[in-house]
């Protein structure tokens, strides 16, 4: 086995969301968070000698400025001629290789856009080609799937059965079905003959959570769908769904967190021990950053890699040889693993054996060509035409069952389906063959179409009244260029031979493997403190020892385990490094040399052994907390990150070290001050957590920030996929927009050899400078809105200017250096110091509204940092979101922080993304779910014991939820909805308050909770009965309200507690008028509804005087 980690395969340090290997095995495409598509050569990835050869290109092409947002999916067509990409910009683009290389600069190949598919209303999560290349399917967060034909790339059908975001697709290898998996916790199988739902599978996903992708796959024999994100007995599983009756088969058990991607090898293997036994290989990738390899013939996993990645695995792709594969992760890296035939226990079968295998399952309806590819419905017909009829071939799979299902659905039998089924592939196949031949000729005729010709077929032309034509332009790539099918990337002959011989080592046994590349070292050269960019390699030695099977992994029946292990739910154990000699790692420097001497490396190795299972100390002084045996990318990491502390590459290392020492001194002084002055009224933490600090912004000589007019919470949601990027500043030059703050920092050397920094602030509007100021010091953070802007310097001085450049406030000295500086669109400025204290100023009033309030308490806070911060528009309440996804808002009315996110609430049936509510509360809570998915693996370096001391896992919470009685679940749901109402009030979100009020009313109505409904309605109606009893004695008592004073829970306190007629600007009685029809849906409540309805109508008809209005008029 060989494991490689080429860090030069990168997307600027951002996440890599998709990876796919070309059918010829010599190219691999990646799509990432930088909105780029990159095509790499596989030889340097899979072979060290090719990586070192300067004559072999690594990056073949980088497609830039095409997509506007993150590229979520890249897929090669089955013939390898085209590459499809799907992005957050709602576009699917088709790329082809042009033989016009005149425009090439730094790349080897020229890939141009052949077609742009528009039709989705939201992010495209995955694209997938049909097995016969006749269709391409795209799925999106708009809850739909669009089928496009690949002749002219036009829409064929739009499938809209899903109720939530569609996050994964897989085609039946026989072309009969398409399967899609969605956030609505369902797997839908569609018939490709008429694009109608065949069945919906929901059972394994009822208790599953959410993840950014749900990528299922289909086994090459067509017998099983391997679905993701399954939950079985509070354990995360990969789910096998049988083709025969769409029943749940086996569960692949062992991942600690959700399985988000499954990929099946396209090969069918024959077992070495039993030649008659055939099996398939399945790869699973999870949020626990673990890869697991499974065989359909074994109840246990064949391989587990736990330390290859630091974060969630997003995509996997098999090589065409069936022995190797690549995977990509949210941490922005790619891994390559190559296995030997003996390690998987078999070898791929040939075309003849494959033909016999398929005939046993599907009869003569499926045949195999000379290359081993499936041909559909070719019995007695033309093979070429049958191949092109692929998706519409009617296979005789359970014909009686299918006929009965269609008969029940339609009432009477369909002539087409009846003929197709009864014919058993006879007349039905003939019809499909004719269509297939026609399509085949069309495919041949369009195979030479160029981008310009194809665009002319799709472009829109409008005839104007004057006879002129208006043509809507379509992006077609780079002019008229010939699109050719890419040929395999050539490498020298001696490297081909070396590549062939590199896999000649064979293990001695067929046992499950567990690899942990971060814990197996063989030489001092594998120092984790090295900053080189070499490829990490793990290979088997010539005399491997027998490897211990991984106990908790096993194929699990729905009602029992196959492997008989009683420790089924235990965590996978880590093997002792001292007893494991199966793998070794060595690092090679291909880009730059390490600046550490041997003594430093040895010290780093010792520190790594002692700290590898501890939580990283964010911002602390221990520089060895960044130790990792895997090589890191040479590109800069984001400033705000959960990852370990990095060293600055600028010339200000000494200055930053002095700042860190001063910061530590300040923390110690503050701690002593707090202990010696217990009676001080200042809001200062009595104990500052040891080592807790927030990373300071990266020092740069140019800062530009665009002042955005949209609400801050909306931008926070839009940027949720990049939570670790600095929310305050960007260093990208040439920012466009209406208003820009631009800062240029210069340094001047004085006579005493000291350096003085000056910052020039320019306020630009449509590239026109409105004003300019020059201040002493080095500005680190800027923020503002269209009315004012604020800046802080390295010396911890805060300046605030108005829109004309006049100082509003200046020389404000916070308690420490600032790590965050944020503003809203009105008058509030938020600042967070590096030691975790929050201040909010009202700039218009020139006064502080929150002074040095410590961040909220969190368990293990020293291992967390702030993801982003914001301040609300109306009242200027600070909102802080931590790296674990938890969000808090400070309420001056309560005088404490209020937690917005709720892990138990995430299990509620009402907590779903399928809502049109997009207020600040749902934004923050959705952010919590998405960020926890993206960064779910950030604590992988924490030991199992420390994880147990932290918050309970989702699996345990699910187990707890499942064990609750119906009454307990009702109490939990009621509590969750009441929390939502309270949080909406704290955040002053009136629309969300109304949204949750209606849901709360509906829930109480379904449960027939008369006490809480009466409480709610009485509060919305107001203390009318009590006040009128006092003002009018008993004139309207029981006549108008129908309620006695004792029946009104608010009546006894109505005189002492003033009642407000509005809540968050909404009229309470108008809200009561809206919820009464909901309550009327339960006839048990009709008497109570009638009483409140009568009282409400009395006010509108002036029969009953509104006592609240009477009190106001006095």
UniProtKB/Swiss-Prot annotation:
Biased composition regions of type Low complexity, renumbered to the chain: 515-545, 649-681
Biased composition (Basic and acidic residues): 565-578, 596-611
Composition skew (Basic residues), residue ranges: 581-595
Stored Gene3D superfamilies: YVTN repeat-like/Quinoprotein amine dehydrogenase
GO MF term list: transcription corepressor activity
Record region (Disordered): 405-449, 499-682
One of the GO biological process terms: regulation of transcription by RNA polymerase II
Keyword Transcription tagged: yes
SUPFAM superfamilies: WD40 repeat-like
WD repeats: 10-50, 66-105, 119-158, 161-200, 209-251, 262-304, 308-347
Residue stretches of biased makeup (Gly residues): 412-429
Family matches, as InterPro entries: CAF1B_HIR1_beta-prop, HIR1-like, HIRA-like_C, HIRA_B_motif, Ig-like_dom, WD40/YVTN_repeat-like_dom_sf, WD40_repeat_dom_sf, WD40_rpt
Compartment(s) where it occurs, according to its Swiss-Prot or TrEMBL record: Nucleus
Main location: nucleus
Sorted UniProt keywords: Chromatin regulator, Nucleus, Repeat, Transcription, Transcription regulation, WD repeat
GO cellular component: chromatin; HIR complex; nucleus
Top-rank taxon: Eukaryota
Function noted in UniProt: Required for the periodic repression of histone gene transcription during the cell cycle. Promotes replication-independent chromatin assembly.
Annotated family: Belongs to the WD repeat HIR1 family.
Protein name, per record: Protein HIRA
Lineage: Eukaryota, Amoebozoa, Evosea, Eumycetozoa, Dictyostelia
Underlying gene: hira
């Amino acid at each position: 086995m060989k494991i490689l980690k080429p860090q030069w395969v990168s997307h600027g340090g951002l996440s890599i969301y998709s990876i796919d290997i070309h059918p010829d095995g010599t190219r691999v495409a990646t799509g990432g968070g930088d909105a780029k598509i990159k095509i790499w050569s596989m030889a340097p990835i899979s072979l060290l000698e090719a990586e070192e050869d300067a004559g072999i290109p690594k990056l073949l092409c980088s497609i830039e400025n095409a997509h506007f947002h993150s590229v979520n999916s890249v897929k090669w067509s089955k013939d390898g001629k085209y590459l499809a990409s799907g992005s957050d910009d709602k576009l699917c683009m088709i790329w082809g290789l042009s033989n016009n290389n005149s425009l090439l600069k730094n790349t080897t190949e020229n890939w141009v856009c052949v077609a742009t598919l528009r039709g989705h209303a939201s992010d495209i999560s995955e694209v997938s080609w049909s097995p016969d290349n006749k269709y391409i399917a795209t799925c999106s967060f708009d809850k739909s799937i669009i089928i496009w034909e690949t002749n002219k790339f036009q829409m064929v059908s739009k499938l809209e059965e899903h109720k939530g975001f569609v996050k994964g697709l897989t085609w039946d290898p026989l072309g009969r079905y398409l399967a899609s998996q969605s956030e609505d916790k369902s797997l839908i199988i569609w018939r490709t003959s008429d694009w109608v739902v065949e069945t919906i599978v929901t059972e394994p996903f009822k208790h599953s959570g959410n993840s950014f992708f749900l990528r299922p796959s289909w086994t090459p024999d067509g017998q099983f769908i391997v679905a993701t994100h399954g939950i079985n007995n509070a354990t995360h599983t990969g789910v096998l769904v049988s083709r025969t009756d769409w029943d749940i088969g086996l569960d692949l058990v062992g991942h600690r967190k959700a399985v988000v991607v499954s990929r099946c090898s396209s090969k069918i293997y024959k077992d070495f021990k039993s030649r008659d036994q055939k099996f398939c290989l399945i790869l699973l990738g999870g949020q626990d950053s673990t890869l697991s390899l499974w065989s359909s013939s074994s109840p246990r996993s064949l391989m587990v890699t736990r330390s290859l990645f630091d974060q969630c695995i997003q995509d996997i792709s098999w090589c065409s040889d069936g022995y190797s594969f690549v995977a990509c992760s949210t941490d922005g890296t790619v891994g390559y693993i190559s296995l030997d035939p003996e390690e998987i226990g078999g070898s791929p079968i040939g075309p003849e054996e494959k033909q016999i295998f398929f005939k046993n399952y599907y009869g003569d309806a499926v045949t195999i060509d000379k290359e081993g590819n499936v041909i559909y419905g070719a019995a007695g017909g033309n093979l070429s035409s049958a191949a092109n009829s692929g998706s519409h071939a009617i296979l005789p799979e359970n014909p009686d069952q299918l006929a009965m299902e269609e008969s029940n659905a339609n009432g009477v039998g369909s002539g087409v389906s009846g003929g197709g089924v009864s014919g058993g592939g006879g007349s039905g196949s003939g019809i499909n063959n004719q269509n297939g031949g026609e399509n085949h000729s069309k495919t041949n005729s369009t195979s030479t179409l160029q981008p310009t010709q194809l665009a002319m077929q799709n472009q829109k032309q409008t005839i104007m009244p004057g006879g002129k034509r208006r043509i809507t332009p379509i992006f077609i790539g780079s002019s008229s260029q010939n699109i050719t099918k890419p040929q395999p990337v050539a490498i020298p002959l001696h490297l081909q031979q070396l590549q062939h011989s590199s896999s000649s080592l064979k293990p001695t046994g067929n046992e499950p493997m567990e690899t942990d590349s971060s814990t197996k070292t063989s030489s001092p050269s594998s120092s984790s403190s090295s900053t080189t960019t070499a490829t990490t390699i793990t290979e088997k030695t010539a005399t491997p020892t027998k490897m211990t099977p991984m106990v908790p992994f096993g194929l699990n029946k729905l009602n029992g385990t196959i492997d008989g292990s009683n420790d089924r739910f235990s965590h996978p154990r880590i093997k002792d490094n001292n007893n494991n000699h199966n793998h070794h790692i060595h690092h090679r420097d291909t880009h730059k040399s390490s600046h550490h001497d041997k003594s430093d490396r040895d010290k780093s190795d010792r520190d790594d052994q002692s700290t590898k299972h501890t939580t990283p100390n964010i911002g602390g002084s221990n520089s060895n907390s960044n130790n990792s045996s895997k090589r890191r990318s040479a590109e800069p990491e984001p400033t705000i990150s959960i990852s370990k502390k990095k060293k600055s590459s600028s010339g200000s290392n000494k200055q930053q070290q002095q700042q860190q020492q001063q910061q530590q001194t300040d923390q110690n002084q503050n701690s002593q001050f707090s202990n010696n002055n217990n009676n001080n009224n200042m809001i200062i933490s009595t104990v500052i957590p040891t080592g807790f600090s927030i990373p300071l912004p990266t020092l740069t000589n140019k800062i530009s920030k665009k002042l955005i007019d949209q609400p801050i919470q909306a931008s926070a949601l839009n940027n949720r996929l990049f939570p670790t990027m600095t929310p305050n500043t960007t260093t990208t030059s040439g920012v466009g927009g209406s208003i820009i703050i631009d800062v240029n920092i210069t340094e001047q050397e004085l006579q005493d050899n000291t350096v003085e920094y000056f910052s020039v602030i320019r306020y630009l509007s449509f590239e026109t400078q409105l004003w300019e100021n020059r201040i002493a010091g080095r500005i680190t953070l800027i923020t503002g809105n269209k009315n004012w802007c604020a800046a802080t310097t390295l010396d911890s001085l805060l300046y605030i200017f108005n829109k004309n450049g006049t100082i509003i406030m200046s020389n404000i000295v916070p308690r420490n250096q600032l790590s965050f500086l944020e503003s809203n669109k009105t008058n509030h400025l938020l600042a967070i110091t590096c030691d975790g204290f929050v201040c909010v100023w009202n700039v218009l009033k020139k006064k502080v509204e929150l002074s040095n309030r410590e961040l909220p308490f969190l368990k293990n806070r020293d291992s967390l940092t702030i993801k982003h911060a914001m301040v609300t528009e109306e009242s200027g309440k600070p909102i802080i979101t931590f790296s674990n996804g938890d969000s808090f808002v400070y309420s001056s009315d309560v005088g404490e922080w209020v937690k917005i996110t709720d892990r138990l609430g995430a299990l509620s049936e009402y907590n779903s993304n399928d809502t049109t509510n997009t207020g600040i509360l749902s934004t923050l809570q959705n952010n919590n779910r998405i960020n926890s998915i993206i960064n779910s693996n950030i604590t992988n370096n924490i030991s199992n014991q420390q994880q147990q001391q932290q918050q309970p896992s989702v699996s345990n919470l699910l187990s707890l939820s499942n064990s609750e009685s119906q009454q307990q679940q009702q109490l939990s749901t009621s509590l969750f909805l009441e929390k939502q109402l309270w949080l909406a009030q704290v955040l002053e979100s009136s629309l969300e308050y109304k949204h949750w009020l209606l849901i709360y009313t509906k829930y109480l109505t379904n449960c027939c909770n008369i006490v809480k409904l009466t409480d709610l309605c009485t509060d919305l109606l107001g203390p009318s009965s009590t006040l009128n009893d006092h003002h009018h004695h008993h004139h309207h008592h029981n006549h108008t309200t129908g309620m006695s004073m004792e029946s009104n829970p608010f009546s006894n306190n109505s005189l002492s507690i003033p009642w407000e007629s509005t809540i968050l600007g909404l009229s309470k009685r108008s809200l009561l008028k809206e919820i009464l029809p909901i309550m009327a849906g339960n006839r048990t409540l009709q008497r109570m509804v009638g009483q409140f309805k009568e009282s409400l109508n009395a006010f509108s008809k002036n029969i009953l005087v509104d006592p609240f209005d009477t009190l106001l008029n006095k």
